[in-house]
């Protein structure tokens, strides 16, 4: 897995090497396409993106070049253009049934073979496994959820535009704390959490604590674990006075910025009860 900077570097090398088939493992299509667009502008290569909602478009100009929204139609258009022009790159965002040997995967396989001969590249954004015979024609790269550094940029992009229109009490340390809390969420999830907090018309230091509670609304129960909602009066658990005393003593360490030591503070304490 890779953060955005590492992902961009790896993808840049693959584009320059004209790898015929690139599979991108990510659940965040928008972040992947954002990076692809940056690379298209930086190295000045033609890149086209196919989606079920817009058909095939030029990623730089956003101009539609083929209005056929079906995957088969998009592949036909890509293969036709790759056979006529060299060094073209096509990105497909929604291709299903590629895990096994079937009509879709073989259609894609044929397109990649054409790309090999013409210096083209077909890129696939997916979270699924890929038919092994197809995968062997290319390479795979993955994009992680935003880390703290990238999340800090996301937080500032969401909050700072409202600096003059609503009361904002956050300082640099508060932005960093919010980024640490929201790290490893998807970008859209973090933006939704922040938008929900700002919807009340202000952003105070107390809202930092509310970010953790807002995250609970994004996640359902994990298999084997059940989230139990309790009120503050029920937090007194017998036999844990020693733990509470230790946590009070270690509070500064648990909430400090430990990036210089390549450590991150714990997110909480998990109490496990054993029946009997």
Regions found by a protein language model. Give the residues of each.
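P-loop NTPase Walker A phosphate-binding motif
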Residues: 33-45
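Short regulatory helix/loop adjacent to the ATP-binding pocket of P-loop NTPases
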Residues: 36, 127-145
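AAA+/SF3 P-loop NTPase mechanochemical coupling elements
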Residues: 93, 114-122, 263-269
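Conserved P-loop NTPase "ATPase switch" module shared by AAA+ and STAND
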Residues: 49-112, 121-125
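AAA+ P-loop ATPase motor domain of ring mechanoenzymes
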Residues: 2-28, 53-62, 139-140, 144-145, ...
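Short glycine-/polar-rich loops that comprise or flank the Walker A/P-loop
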Residues: 18-19, 43-46, 86-87, 118-121, ...
